[in-house]
């Protein structure tokens, strides 16, 4: 029941799944969805809620089988307030250029000037859900781009509301978790340490080989300005730029 939702400390997995399904089916109006988003500005999302939201989005996705490529997705939550360029998107081209297969899942920016889809669109990429075109892109360029609203009705439905609110929401957390390809590998950047651990818990049971990163000065990626945490299956480690052979810099 969405009406009692704001007064609860958390909901269980099944309730969270039902809420996302109802959004996709148009059972809530824009004001109700905006209120739901606002709840998570006032309290943290639980592991069960995140898992339920994720399950609902994956159940309703348009599935895409590119498993033969054993691809990686490199993605950040955004919402770190740092006004950087699209570092994870640029990284995808570097990795693909090195010969590794990348399946990038992204959207238009909700809290920033430019999301991954804005960048891709400006560079002439034509968004498609055609599996044959995506496969040809992987074969010829080692990269395929999946514009999120084409593959999930919920993400399409909430996009205008997220943009009008202009604040970081739990959909920032969900986007990186619901790549419809279910890639073999994921490198995920998050905007705070609690979310790093939340992602890590979520992925422990998934079979995905993952790493979640957060720079301690607030970036949702590895930076050269501070130490950064990396969470991987069964371990979490603190790194410095110097450990990777880089000089530290100031913002």
Predicted region positions:
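Short beta-strand segments at enzyme active-site cores
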Residues: 32-33, 103-105, 212-213
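Glycine-rich anion-binding loops and their surrounding alpha/beta cores
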Residues: 62, 84, 99, 122-128, ...
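Short, small-residue-biased leader/transition segments that mark boundaries at the very start
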Residues: 3-10
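Active-site cofactor/substrate anionic-group-binding motifs, chiefly glycine-
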Residues: 44-110
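N-terminal Rossmann-like NAD(P)+-binding subdomain of aldehyde/semialdehyde dehydrogenases
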Residues: 11-58
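Positions that flank functional sites
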Residues: 55, 110, 135, 153, ...
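A glycine-rich phosphate/pyrophosphate-binding beta-strand-loop-alpha-helix module
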Residues: 37, 85-141
């Amino acid at each position: 029941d969405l009406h009692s939702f704001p007064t609860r400390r958390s909901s269980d997995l099944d309730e969270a799944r039902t809420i996302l399904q109802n959004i996709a089916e148009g059972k809530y109006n824009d004001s109700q969805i905006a209120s739901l988003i606002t709840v998570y500005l006032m309290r943290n999302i639980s592991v069960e809620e995140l898992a339920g939201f994720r399950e609902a989005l994956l159940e309703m996705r348009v599935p895409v089988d590119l498993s033969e490529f054993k691809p990686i997705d490199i993605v950040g939550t955004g919402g770190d307030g740092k006004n950087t360029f699209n570092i994870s998107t640029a990284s995808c081209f570097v990795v693909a250029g090195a010969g590794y297969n990348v399946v990038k899942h992204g959207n238009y920016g909700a809290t920033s000037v430019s999301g991954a889809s804005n960048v891709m669109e400006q560079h002439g990429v034509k968004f498609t859900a055609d599996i044959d075109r995506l496969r040809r892109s992987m074969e010829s360029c080692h990269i395929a781009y999946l514009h999120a609203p084409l593959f999930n009705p919920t993400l399409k439905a909430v996009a205008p509301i997220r943009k009008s609110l202009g604040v970081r929401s739990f959909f920032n957390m969900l986007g990186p978790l619901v790549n419809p390809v279910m890639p073999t590998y994921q490198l995920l950047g998050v905007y705070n340490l609690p979310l790093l651990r939340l992602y890590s818990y979520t992925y422990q049971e998934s079979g995905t080989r993952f790493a979640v990163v957060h720079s301690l000065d607030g970036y949702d990626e590895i930076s050269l300005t501070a130490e950064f945490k990396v969470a991987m299956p069964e371990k979490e480690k603190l790194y410095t730029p110097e450990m990777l052979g880089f000089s530290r810099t100031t913002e």
